[in-house]
Regions:
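Short, threonine-centered small-residue motifs that mark membrane-proximal processing/anchoring sites
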Residues: 348-351
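Ribokinase/PfkB-type carbohydrate-kinase core domain
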Residues: 1-63, 84-88, 105, 113-344, ...
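The catalytic Tyr-X3-Lys active-site helix of short-chain dehydrogenase/reductase
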Residues: 353, 357, 394, 398
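Active-site alpha-helical elements of protease catalytic centers
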Residues: 87-111, 355-359
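Active-site gating loops and adjacent loop-to-helix segments of metal-dependent hydrolytic enzymes
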Residues: 56-80
Length: 431
């Protein structure tokens, strides 16, 4: 596993010359990977004016499932007017796993349904071609029918709205979930989109995977999808999250829809009553990370202390997140960071920024598992932690990855972060 080296604030991970622990003295590390269940989609990106949202029947910033024939008709019109700017491998979980594998140079596995018949230059061919070779696709379930598609309408303000053509994306049966693979992962990554339709095969498959992960002690990570989806299924989602989910990720609108709190800190705090760790993104206002830590493991920040809706909310942001169940005296910890370098100069669209941030968090969680297996006697593992780094450092890392996604105007990274940041003076690297 690649451990990112020096960055804007020295280390995301310690990489050399710490001299604390000899890996050779401990047990040999097992393979570390993450598993995700995704709706395999091809994103069809089109730059349009707001009138197209009404024509497609999609609310601004939301995602709606539409009739396949209607999507075919709209797609033909977009092509005829030369509004389609690209067609890419997509899907929230697919993007997250791809970016995780690129960042960590490590394996991940994608579970889902894909069309049985794949030919050169069709949608399924391009999906596979644009997915990192480190993402294992050998557990995909082949099904008769077309590939799922997401028409991504990007308006002048950079907002993206999706019209979804299902194809076979929901046809993953519970019997296709590989129990041993899920139970051996460092995390199980899911999205609330999988839970939209309780009659769909993928719903039962997702619940089955959750049960396997819960029984094996594998953290279940859920991204919330869209605010409209959360509003529609709020009560059932809250019950499922409280029962089976460990880590929650979403933007402010989505977390607010789940918790009823519109302030980001209060929304994150309310979400922590359901889960152990919360990643909350807020567009141009950066991102927040909230978690639990035992009072004995709380570490005070050495940065300025800030107060917002929660007084001195970042006082213990140098703490590493722990499962609440592992805390004798649990307390909440929060950190916030503004966009890296003020954000990308030009934001063509925000597609994938949240998936990138979540990939960074997953990298840190997997690194914790990797280190614990490699050096179980290290003092870093005297308590049961969810993360390798502090919530403060993870905020910085997630923020940097989001910036890279926005800067490249694509939801999937083509390479990891640079070994040296161009913004830093040369003597920094010699320090």
């Amino acid at each position: 596993m690649r451990f990112p080296g020096k960055r804007k604030s020295k280390h995301y991970f310690p990489v050399a010359d710490r001299g604390l622990v000899s890996f050779a003295e401990d047990a040999e590390a097992k393979d570390v990977y993450i598993v995700g269940i995704g709706q395999l989609l091809v994103d069809i990106e089109a730059h349009v004016d707001a009138s197209w949202l009404e024509r497609l029947g999609v609310a601004a910033g939301q995602s709606e499932v539409l009739d396949d024939d209607w999507v075919d008709k709209v797609y033909a019109e977009l092509k005829a007017e030369d509004l389609v700017v690209g067609e890419y491998a997509g899907g929230s979980v697919g993007n997250t796993l791809h970016n995780f594998s690129v960042l960590a140079d490590n394996r991940s596995f994608l579970l889902g349904a894909i069309t049985r018949h794949i030919t050169v230059n069709d949608y399924a061919f391009h999906y596979i071609r644009h997915t990192s070779a480190r993402v294992g696709l050998n557990h995909l379930a082949p099904r008769d029918g077309p590939m799922g598609r997401a028409v991504c309408l990007v308006t002048a303000d950079g907002e993206r709205s999706f019209g979804i053509s299902r194809g076979v994306m929901d046809d993953l049966p519970a019997s296709a979930i590989p129990e041993e693979l899920v139970a051996g992962g460092a995390a199980l990554v899911l999205t609330a989109y999988l839970l939209r339709d309780e009659t769909a095969p993928i719903f039962a498959a997702t619940v089955r995977a959750m049960e396997i992960a819960n029984a094996a002690g594998v953290p279940v990570v859920l991204s919330l999808g869209t605010a409209s989806l959360v509003h529609h299924r709020r009560d059932s989602l809250r019950a499922l999250i409280a029962d089976k989910v460990d880590v929650l990720a979403g933007n402010l609108d989505e977390v607010a829809a789940l918790t009823g709190e519109t302030d980001p800190l209060l929304a994150a705090s309310a979400a922590l009553e359901l889960v152990d760790l919360v990643l909350l993104t807020r567009d141009r206002h950066g991102l927040y990370l909230g978690g639990w830590v035992d009072e004995s493991e709380a570490r005070e920040t050495r940065d300025p202390i800030h107060s917002k809706a929660i007084p001195e909310y970042n006082l213990y942001e140098y703490s590493r997140a722990m499962p609440r169940s592992a805390c004798t005296q649990p307390q909440k910890v929060f950190s916030h960071i503004n966009p890296y370098h003020g954000g990308a100069k030009v934001v063509a669209n925000t597609n994938g920024a949240g998936d990138g941030a979540l990939a960074a968090l997953l990298h840190d969680m997997a690194a914790n598992v990797h280190h614990r297996q490699s050096a179980p006697t290290s003092p870093k593992h005297r308590s049961r932690f969810l993360t390798y780094s502090s919530v403060h450092q993870i905020c910085k890392y997630a923020n940097r990855v989001s910036f890279e996604v926005l800067r490249r105007h694509a939801p999937r990274l083509v390479q990891g972060l640079p070994e040296r940041e161009d913004s830093l003076e040369e003597d920094y690297w010699d320090a």
